[in-house]
């Protein structure tokens, strides 16, 4: 799948613009602060209903405007075009429309337009808290396993009920036992989906990483969030007093982690910034391959400042891996000459110059594969 049209209004410093991007490679270039990243942010808003640059909405909406809007047309894997739109107001209200109908949640956007983001904050996948790696893992499971979302929603409901009881003690013993059983059942299903996904991801990740950098001792391992040799119900019972003292549930899939280690140590503590970027890129690209294999469409990749941290050899290797996915890619850079030789002659590449918030298409080369 790919975006065939994107219209942006009142997103940061961008002038109103409608783009007709290439179905494959799109390069947005210009000086720092020109608005290149804001184009990626607008697409991210369209696919996930939130910004990747700010937890707050106000900075995203242009000064003196009441709301920002992004519309897009997506060519789905079955060849049918789908129209998406989102409007977000300063007060936090948002409207999502898919093919003329109001959507119930951002999950419908994410399902229609799977997005992968690679930007300077991507290092947090290695350096950050386990929550970031759980989000990475669950994003992948969501896009290849249609049964995952309702089970995840059951898990969240059971966790909320149990944590509320731990803080306030307003459940009778029978109700507490029922919610513990529901939590345990949903947790086992989530664990099974995650474990299956990791088993599929690991060989694809290792193969992808080998194309970028030699790190033979780098390993992925999965911690499910509680003792692998014990049933969660047993763990919940034995940790009840401590859970009550803490006010929340200590064990379960909400404590899971994807551990990325090099020679037995936390990889983030050993790898250079360039190596970390390549590891993150390999993980994200591997996820794209799994979506392709599941025949659930293709990711759209947003790559902010691809050349940073990378020498020419690694830039070209990363370009080829993105190209080999056969998906749509949006890349920002200051100097387009750094990327001009990264693509095959028959790959359609569109170039967009961004200056003071104005986006203009400058070149289209190659032909549709």
UniProtKB/Swiss-Prot annotation:
Give the SUPFAM superfamilies listed for this entry.
P-loop containing nucleoside triphosphate hydrolases
Give the CC-aspect GO terms: cytoplasm
Pfam families of this UniProt entry? Answer: SMC_N
| Coiled-coil regions, chain positions | none
Fetch the PROSITE patterns from UniProt: RECF_1, RECF_2
Spell out the disulfide connections: none
**Keyword vocabulary terms for this entry:** ATP-binding, Cytoplasm, DNA damage, DNA repair, DNA replication, DNA-binding, Nucleotide-binding, SOS response
Instruction: Provide one Gene Ontology biological process annotation.
Output: DNA synthesis involved in DNA repair
Q: Where does ATP bind?
A: 30-37
Where in the cell? Cytoplasm
**Single GO MF descriptor:** ATP binding
Write down the InterPro entries for this protein, in alphabetical order. DNA-binding_RecF, DNA-binding_RecF_CS, P-loop_NTPase, RecF/RecN/SMC_N, RecF_2
**So what family is this one in?**
Belongs to the RecF family.
What does this protein's UniProt record list under function? The RecF protein is involved in DNA metabolism; it is required for DNA replication and normal SOS inducibility. RecF binds preferentially to single-stranded, linear DNA. It also seems to bind ATP.
User: What protein does this entry describe?
Assistant: DNA replication and repair protein RecF
């Amino acid at each position: 799948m790919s975006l065939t049209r994107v219209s942006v209004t009142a997103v940061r410093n961008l002038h109103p613009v409608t783009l007709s991007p290439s179905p494959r490679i799109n390069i947005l270039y210009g000086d720092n602060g020109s608005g290149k990243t804001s184009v990626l942010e607008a697409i991210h808003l369209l696919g996930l209903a939130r910004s990747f640059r700010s937890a707050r909405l106000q900075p995203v909406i242009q000064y003196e405007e009441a709301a920002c809007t992004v519309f897009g047309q997506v060519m789905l894997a079955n060849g049918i075009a789908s129209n998406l739109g989102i409007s977000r107001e300063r007060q936090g209200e948002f409207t999502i429309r898919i093919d003329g109908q109001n959507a119930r949640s951002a999950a419908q956007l994410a399902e229609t337009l799977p997005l992968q983001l690679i930007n300077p904050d991507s290092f947090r996948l290695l350096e950050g808290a386990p929550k970031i790696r759980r989000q990475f893992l669950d994003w992948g499971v969501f896009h290849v396993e249609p049964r995952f979302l309702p089970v995840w929603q059951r898990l969240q409901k059971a966790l909320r009920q149990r944590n509320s009881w731990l803080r306030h003690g307003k459940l009778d013993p029978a109700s507490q036992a029922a919610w513990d059983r529901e939590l345990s059942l949903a947790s086992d299903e989530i664990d099974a989906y995650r474990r299956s996904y990791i088993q599929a991801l690991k060989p694809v990740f290792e193969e992808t990483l080998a194309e970028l950098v030699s790190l033979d001792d780098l390993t992925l391992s999965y911690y499910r969030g509680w003792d692998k040799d014990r049933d969660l119900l047993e763990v919940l019972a034995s940790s009840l007093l401590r859970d009550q003292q803490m006010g929340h549930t200590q064990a379960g899939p909400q404590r899971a982690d994807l551990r990325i280690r090099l020679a037995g140590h936390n990889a983030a503590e050993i790898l250079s910034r360039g190596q970390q970027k390549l590891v993150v890129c390999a993980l994200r690209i591997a996820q794209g391959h799994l979506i392709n294999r599941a025949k659930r469409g293709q990711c759209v990749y947003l790559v902010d400042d691809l050349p940073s941290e990378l020498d020419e050899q690694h830039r070209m290797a990363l370009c080829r891996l993105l190209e080999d996915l056969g998906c749509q890619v949006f890349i920002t850079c200051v100097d387009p000459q750094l990327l001009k030789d990264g693509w095959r002659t028959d790959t359609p590449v569109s170039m967009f110059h961004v200056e003071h918030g104005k986006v203009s298409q400058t070149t289209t080369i190659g032909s549709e594969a």
